[in-house]
Amino acid sequence: MATGEPRDRGGYYFRFLPQRTFSSLSAREITNRLRQWSMLGRIQAQAFGFDQTFQPYQKDDFVTAFFKDPNVIPHLQLLAESSGQWTTLGTEVKRIEAINVPCTQLSMSFFQRLYDENIVRESGHIVKCLDSFCDPFLISDELRKVLLMEDSEKYEVFSPVEREEFLFCLFKHLCLGGSLCQYEDVLKPYLETAKLIYKDLVSVRKHPRTKEIQITSSVFKVKAYDSLGVCYPSPKEHEQTFSYFVVDPIKRHVNVLYHCYGVGEMA
């Protein structure tokens, strides 16, 4: 049997946690930013509990069980491609794909190099450039060149491994936004929002002996397939359509961050 193909529910049982809210996505200042970035109404976080010990190598069994669980099926939200309304999956998952996403960053100093390399001025303003396209994104500043253009001279400011980091992925998703994204002139809103969402989703603990802060969560980028192809996060694939599962093995919680690329709420 191929990796990721459902066998049974792998011993995991889940429960929806509607009482777990995510202030990083609901605070007024953040919703105003998400509206400007054309992501409001198209991004959501949900929490689920589970009842078994979790190890990262069990990710395929874990995610397969998640999509099969009767306590998940009526609650897991996604945007319908046709109506653009929130709905549930409504199809049987035949196969899953769960990719490990490194999650090691404990500080926003990770992005200091944007200042050091003159991608962002000391004032916080993002350096502009001549407009170009990296389909489907308009590139009008040095930040988006660093994020998208592999042949740009400063693309190597972040290594391939660093670009896989969950914090970098969040930051990039916010910078690129939805289909009618209005870009920021300054860096601060992107950094602040990425930090808030990251802290809201990722669990840490203090090591009992060394007192060092450690990240305890494991992160996976997830897709699910039915008999026709990709069904989750959306049948229509896009770099800005994603679902991340952030698993806390100590609390036995999984936070699901979902976004579907399109036109966000404007009013």
From Swiss-Prot:
Membrane-spanning ranges: none
Keywords, A to Z? Cell projection, Cytoplasm, Cytoskeleton
Report the domain of life of the source organism. Answer: Eukaryota
Output the InterPro entries linked to this UniProt entry.
CFAP300
**Where is it localised?**
Cytoplasm; Cytoplasm, Cytoskeleton, Cilium axoneme
Q: What does this protein do?
A: Cilium- and flagellum-specific protein that plays a role in axonemal structure organization and motility. May play a role in outer and inner dynein arm assembly.
Q: Which family does it belong to?
A: Belongs to the CFAP300 family.
How the protein assembles, per its UniProt entry? Interacts with DNAAF2.
The protein depicted here goes by the name Cilia- and flagella-associated protein 300
Look up and give the organism this protein is from.
Rattus norvegicus
